[in-house]
C-alpha cells in the first residue's frame, strides 16, 4: 500500500505552499525597509542609503549582518520568558494570518470558509505581544508604550471588523475566494463600499502602528516605546513584523476591495499574480507616503478620531449596506 495517497499529497502540497508563502513574506518584509528608506529619500529630495553596493542595494544585507551579530542581551530586571516570547508572538501571528489570503486562483495556503474570522483571530494576538513586551521589560516607558499600543489596537480593530461587515453582507460569505470571485462578476468593492474601504485603510494604518498612528513608539515622549529594552534578533523580529503587517493590510485591501488577482475590466487575466503584486505594491507605497507627508497627532486626538469619526462612519455604512441588500432580496425580508 502506497503512503502517497491523495490526502497525503494534498497535505504535502499545502505545507510546501505555506513554507514558500511565509518565506516570501519574511524576505519582502526585510527588503521593504530598504525600499522605504530609498523612497523617503527620493520624496524628501535627499540621499537615501547609497554607500553599500550599487545604489545602496546591499544596505539591507549589511543591516541584517549587523543585527545577526549584535549581542542578544537580556537586561537583568526583565521577565526572561515573557520578554523572549513577545517578539515571537508579534511576528508569528502576522505570518499565520497570511495563510488565508488567496494570491492567485491556484496559489493560496488555506481556503477557509471563515477566512476573515481567522484573520481577526490572528491579528488580535498582536495585542498580547505588545502587552507582554511592555510588562516584561520592567521599564516605565515600555509599559506606557504598550498600554498606548494595546488601547489603540483594540479600538481600531473594532472598526477594522465593522468596515468589512459591509463586504460580508453583500457577498454572504467570510471566504476570501468567494469575495474575490464576487468582484470578478460585479463592481470592485472600492465603489459600493467606499466608506468601508476608507475606514479599513485608516484602521489598518493604526493597527500596524505606522505613522501617523505611531504614538506607542513616539521617540520624543516614550523613547521608542514598548521595545526600548530589546536588541539584536528580538528587536529585529519586532522591526520585520511591522513591515509584515504593512504587507498583510495591503494584501487584504487588494483582496477585499480591489478585486484580488483580477485586473480592471478583465484585462490580462493570464497574469493574476502580476495584478495582485502591483496592487499590493501600490498600497505599500501609500503607507510609506503617509510617513513622508503627514505629521504625528497627539494620542488623545488619535483615540477621539477613532470613536467619534470611525465608529459612526462604519455603522452608517453597515446599516445602509444591509438596507440595500434587504431591499434587493424581498423574499428574505418577507420571511
From Swiss-Prot:
Keywords: Cell inner membrane, Cell membrane, Membrane, NAD, Quinone, Translocase, Transmembrane, Transmembrane helix, Ubiquinone
A molecular function GO annotation: NADH dehydrogenase activity
Membrane association type: Multi-pass membrane protein
A single GO cellular-component term on record: plasma membrane
Predominant place of localization: membrane
Superkingdom of the organism of origin: Bacteria
Transmembrane segments: 11-31, 81-101, 114-134, 154-174, 187-207, 238-258, 270-290, 307-327
EC number of this enzyme: 7.1.1.-
Family recorded in the similarity comment: Belongs to the complex I subunit 1 family.
Quaternary structure annotation from Swiss-Prot or TrEMBL: NDH-1 is composed of 13 different subunits. Subunits NuoA, H, J, K, L, M, N constitute the membrane sector of the complex.
Protein name as catalogued: NADH-quinone oxidoreductase subunit H
Organism: Pseudomonas entomophila (strain L48)
Source organism phylogeny: Bacteria, Pseudomonadati, Pseudomonadota, Gammaproteobacteria, Pseudomonadales
Amino acid at each position: 500500500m502506497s503512503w502517497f495517497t491523495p490526502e497525503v499529497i494534498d497535505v504535502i502540497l499545502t505545507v510546501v505552499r505555506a513554507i514558500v508563502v511565509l518565506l516570501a513574506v519574511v524576505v519582502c518584509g526585510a527588503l521593504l525597509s530598504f525600499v522605504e528608506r530609498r523612497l523617503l529619500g527620493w520624496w524628501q529630495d535627499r540621499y537615501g542609503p547609497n554607500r553599500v553596493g550599487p545604489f545602496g542595494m546591499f544596505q539591507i544585507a549589511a543591516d541584517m549582518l549587523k543585527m545577526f551579530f549584535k549581542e542578544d542581551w537580556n537586561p537583568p530586571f526583565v521577565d526572561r520568558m515573557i520578554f523572549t516570547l513577545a517578539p515571537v508572538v508579534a511576528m508569528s501571528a502576522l505570518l499565520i494570518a497570511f495563510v488565508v489570503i488567496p494570491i492567485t486562483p491556484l496559489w493560496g495556503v488555506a481556503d477557509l470558509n471563515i477566512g476573515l474570522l481567522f484573520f481577526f483571530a490572528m491579528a488580535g494576538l498582536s495585542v498580547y505581544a505588545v502587552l507582554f513586551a511592555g510588562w516584561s521589560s520592567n521599564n516605565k516607558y515600555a509599559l506606557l508604550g504598550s498600554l498606548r499600543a494595546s488601547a489603540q489596537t483594540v479600538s481600531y480593530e473594532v472598526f477594522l471588523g465593522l468596515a468589512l461587515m459591509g463586504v460580508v453582507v453583500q457577498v454572504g460569505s467570510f471566504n476570501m475566494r468567494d469575495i474575490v470571485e464576487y468582484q470578478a462578476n460585479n463592481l470592485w468593492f472600492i465603489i459600493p463600499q467606499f466608506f468601508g474601504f476608507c475606514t479599513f485603510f485608516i484602521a489598518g494604518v493604526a493597527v500596524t502602528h505606522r505613522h501617523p498612528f505611531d504614538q506607542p513608539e513616539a521617540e520624543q515622549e516614550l523613547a521608542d516605546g514598548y521595545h526600548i529594552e530589546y536588541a539584536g534578533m528580538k528587536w529585529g523580529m519586532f522591526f520585520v513584523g511591522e513591515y509584515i503587517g504593512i504587507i498583510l493590510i495591503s494584501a487584504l485591501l487588494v483582496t477585499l476591495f480591489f478585486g484580488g488577482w483580477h485586473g480592471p475590466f478583465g484585462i490580462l487575466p493570464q497574469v493574476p499574480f502580476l495584478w495582485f503584486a502591483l496592487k499590493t505594491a501600490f498600497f505599500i507605497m501609500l503607507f510609506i507616503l503617509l510617513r513622508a507627508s503627514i505629521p504625528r497627532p497627539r494620542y488623545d486626538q488619535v483615540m477621539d478620531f477613532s470613536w467619534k469619526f470611525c465608529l459612526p462612519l462604519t455603522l452608517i455604512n453597515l446599516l445602509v449596506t444591509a438596507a440595500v441588500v434587504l431591499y434587493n432580496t424581498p423574499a428574505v425580508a418577507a420571511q
